[in-house]
A protein has these predicted regions:
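Ribokinase/PfkB-type carbohydrate-kinase core domain
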Residues: 1-191
């Protein structure tokens, strides 16, 4: 059983398409964001190599208004203890506030976080805004941004610097063609 809690736009919601695309075991809980479209990204690619040329975002990335934030937080708080695993995919588009993070940290049995730094949030969405998690998965540039370190060896950066910023016993950092590097408290780095 899987439940998804998300915000969709008040207009251009694509809610029908989203609901039709879900597997039968997935329940969608929607909070509608006022005066906003559903976040959508269109990529323009060069054929035949499918190389991304540019992308256009349709979204509102300011924080949710107070009423919508309260609805979202209540929905999460009401459901979080029912599940063995909470997976947060935070794209930095204004949905997840400090109050939401507090609920996630206190209520989750196991909290897995992916907080993305991307061209739309300009690096303002660092994984360090989650001081406590059971597992985080980010890419190497996101790990570097999180600890403001462009040059250190990635293994040192993860095992010494990132672990000082986030209380998290399990970390995976994807590293492009090199695969990924994992850290587990007590076992250290595995690459």
């Amino acid at each position: 059983e899987v439940e998804v809690i998300t915000c969709l736009g008040e207009y251009d919601s694509y809610e029908e398409l989203i609901r039709e695309s879900l597997k039968p075991n997935i329940k969608l809980n929607v909070i509608h964001r006022t005066n906003s479209p559903t976040t959508r990204k269109s990529r323009f690619v060069e054929q035949p190599y499918v190389r991304k040329m540019f992308e256009v975002y349709f979204f509102e990335d300011s924080p949710l208004d107070e009423n919508t934030q309260k609805q979202l937080d209540k929905c999460i708080e009401d459901k979080i203890r029912e599940f063995d695993l909470t997976i947060v995919t935070d794209f930095g588009h204004g949905m997840i506030s400090d109050s939401t993070i507090d609920i996630l940290e206190k209520g989750s049995r196991f909290l897995a976080v992916n907080a993305q730094s991307n061209s739309a949030n300009h690096g303002y969405n660092l994984v360090t805004k989650y001081p406590i998690a059971d597992y985080i998965c980010i890419d190497a540039p996101e790990a570097r941004l999180a600890v403001a370190d462009k040059y250190s060896d990635i293994e040192v950066l993860i095992s010494e610097k990132l672990t000082r910023e986030i209380h998290c016993p399990n970390i995976a950092v994807t590293h492009g063609d090199s695969g990924c590097i994992t850290y587990s408290k007590g076992e250290g780095i595995d690459s």
